[in-house]
């Protein structure tokens, strides 16, 4: 059993030890990152999470998303392929998978997938738009699902305009009300993923998502709008993507998020250090030069393709070979090193953990967070 596995077991059994164990993990990662900048050969793949798009089908048409249209149209991951994937992940002691899409609840075998994953000892959570969550939650909860994350794109007509389908906000609210009536926060962890874009970089939008999360006893995760994901688009006239003239709005929004973090530390999933860095991630984009820790990740597409991360470093296809034949191969370790050295489009996936694992970035944004809080 690895040190990481032992630490996770201890944290589950003794939750009070989790902060200390996490701090130790981050410190070890910073040491490795520093060493990797001098000796890249020390960087090797060590998968901690696999993100799996189990279907490209979706019941929305979000402005920023290409799934089911230009990206893998019609693709669905077969149950047998998923079974082989999870068996290999469990054998390799991969701790967790995230199921998403598309809309994962549209997959006919989604409940069986959750049940199988949990039965093999692999942690499992799901990202969904929640439109039909109330119709599936009883079976999913019985199968072992305990955490759900959802995209948040505004409320009322603003939400409907973004997802390009009328009446969907009201349906989502109805679904969430039904879910929470049966499963409170002690039974089901809910998280809203707030997309920080040109449309939402304002205090009013942050207040809206804050009230919405509090209504459902949920946490908030902040996603800075992407500029390099193959399945993401920037909307008509690039209306989602930040521009230099947005700097004042971004700064005010980040300051307000830091204020909320100080008052309600558990509401926002990111640390104050990570939040302070988001201004640079939003405005500097690919000019940010922070080593990437994608060595911890794998991404699986609905067509069976396997990449190191959401953007690049193709490792193979599950329709042609098993995951066990890709994991920790020379190609996998090389991809991990290339990602670390930013020999790639340099996206901002895992931005929060990257700044916390990189000594110079940690010092910079720790000081910035303190200055802006005071």
Where are these regions (language model features)?
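A general structural signal marking secondary-structure boundaries and capping sites
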Residues: 69, 108, 180-183, 261-264, ...
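Polar helix-capping/helix-linker motif
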Residues: 13-16, 271, 328-330
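Conserved alpha-helical substructure of the radical SAM core
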Residues: 5-147, 228-229, 367-368, 374
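Residues that line or immediately flank small-molecule/substrate-binding pockets and catalytic motifs
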Residues: 69, 101, 152, 224, ...
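Residue-level marker of structural boundaries
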Residues: 71, 91, 168, 332-333
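Secreted/processed peptides and extracellular or luminal domains of membrane proteins
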Residues: 64, 68-71, 298, 315, ...
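Radical SAM enzyme [4Fe-4S]-AdoMet core and its adjacent flexible, acidic
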Residues: 1-12, 139-293, 297-307, 311-316, ...
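Flexible mid-to-C-terminal extensions adjoining Fe-S/redox cofactors in radical SAM and related proteins
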Residues: 9-10, 32-33, 41-42, 46, ...
């Amino acid at each position: 059993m690895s040190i990481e596995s032992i630490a996770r077991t201890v944290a589950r059994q003794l939750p009070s030890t989790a902060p200390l164990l996490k701090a130790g993990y981050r410190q070890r990662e910073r040491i490795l990152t520093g060493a990797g900048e001098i000796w890249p050969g020390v960087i090797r793949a060590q998968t901690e999470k696999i993100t799996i798009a189990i279907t490209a089908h979706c019941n929305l048409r979000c402005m920023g998303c290409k799934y089911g249209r230009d990206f893998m149209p019609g693709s669905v991951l077969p149950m047998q392929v998923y079974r082989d994937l999870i068996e290999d992940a469990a054998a390799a002691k991969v701790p967790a998978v995230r199921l998403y899409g598309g809309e994962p609840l549209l997959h006919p075998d989604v409940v069986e997938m959750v049940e199988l994953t949990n039965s093999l000892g692999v942690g499992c959570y799901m990202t969904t738009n929640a439109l039909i969550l109330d119709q599936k939650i009883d079976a999913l909860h019985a199968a072992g699902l305990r955490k759900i994350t959802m995209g948040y794109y505004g409320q009322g007509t603003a939400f409907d305009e973004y997802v390009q389908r009328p009446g969907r906000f009201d349906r989502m609210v109805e679904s969430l009300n039904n879910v929470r009536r049966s499963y409170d926060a002690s039974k089901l962890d809910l998280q809203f993923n707030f997309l920080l874009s040109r449309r939402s970089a304002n205090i009013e939008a942050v207040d809206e998502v804050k009230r919405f999360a509090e209504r459902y006893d949920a946490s908030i995760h902040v996603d800075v709008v992407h500029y390099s994901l193959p399945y993401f688009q920037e909307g008509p006239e690039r209306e989602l993507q930040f521009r230099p003239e947005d700097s004042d709005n971004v700064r005010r929004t980040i300051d307000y998020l830091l204020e909320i973090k100080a008052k309600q530390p558990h509401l926002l999933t990111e640390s104050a250090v990570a939040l302070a860095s988001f201004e640079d991630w939003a405005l500097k984009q690919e000019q940010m030069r922070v080593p990437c820790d994608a060595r911890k990740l794998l991404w699986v597409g609905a067509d069976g393709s396997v990449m190191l991360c959401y953007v690049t470093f193709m490792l193979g296809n599950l329709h042609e070979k098993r995951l066990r034949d890709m994991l920790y191969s020379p190609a996998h370790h090389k991809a991990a090193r290339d990602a670390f050295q930013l020999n790639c489009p340099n996206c901002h996936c895992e931005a929060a953990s990257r700044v916390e694992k990189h000594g110079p970035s940690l010092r910079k944004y720790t000081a910035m967070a303190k200055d802006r809080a005071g």
